[in-house]
Amino acid sequence: MSDAVQSVTVGRRSIPISHPGKQLFTSPAISKLTLARHYARVSEAMLPHVRDRPLALEAFPQGIAGQGFFMKSVPAHFPDWITTTEVPKRGGSLIQVLANDPATLVYLAGQNVVTPHVWLARTIDLRRPDRLIIDLDPSPGVSFADVRAAARDAGERLRAAGLATFAMVTGSRGVHVVSPLRPEAEFATVHRLARALAEAMVSDAPNRLTLEWHRSERGRRIYLDVNRIAYAQHVVAPYGVRARSRAPVAMPIAWEELSDPRLRPDRWTVRTVAGRLESDGDAWARIARHARRLPTLRT
């Protein structure tokens, strides 16, 4: 592929992609231009899930075989048409990117951003999340069948508490179980409920599940991570590409797919996601309609 600048047009903007032939992935070879086109293709499905959420940007200037890094503050060279927000932090504030239009997603890919990560709260109130997420992260040697079973268990418990449940394979190793919330409770309150649910799961299956943060202490168990439910924490965005072989994509799925033995956490890639959306649409298209008030924690 020529190294001359090429453009990707989305809406009214034409985004120049420098070094479009740069291979960001080598197994198989996937270029920066292919990455940019991926985000253009998925933008209609992706934007409702990321709009107005501050982003942490995982970039790989030399491709995923090289050193990656996270960007939280907006670099000075970013164009002024990109929407940003000021995020308060201890001792000051950060200016962070908001992916509120397709052109921003494409521009970020052109800046070697492979994976955007999003807050669980939106700018309307950054201290009150509209998502509760349990991230099921298996240790090496744990079967994905066990991950699927644990995700279904988490869903049953959340529904028993009065919440709706959605699922996403992360494109890496695990599954996110997600309950949409009305943004009324602060992070600490939401975290307490998620933690209590996770503790009950671990109590019922201590040989399969753990809340141990240190990887060396987990053994061959599934880590139930609820610690992303906190101010300034972030999770991989739906339809975000992961920095792994084959360029797998974090894919929202129908809840029933958690019972499919063919399901894998990296089943969909930049080369197959378009077909999935064409045939099945966005599995989270109605997630916002199911947002509910956080239930009272029973003691």
Tell me what each language-model feature is.
Residues 1-36, 47, 51, 93, ...:
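C-terminal accessory nucleic-acid interaction domains of nucleic acid-metabolism proteins
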Residues 1-99, 103-109:
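Charge-rich, low-complexity segments
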Residues 57-60, 165-171, 212-216:
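Short beta-strand
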Residues 64-67, 77, 142, 174-176, ...:
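Flexible loop/turn segments at secondary-structure boundaries
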Residues 97-170, 181-183, 187-189, 299:
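Signature for HUH/AEP ssDNA processing cores
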Residues 176-182, 222-226:
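A short beta-strand motif that forms the metal-chelation/ATP-contact edge
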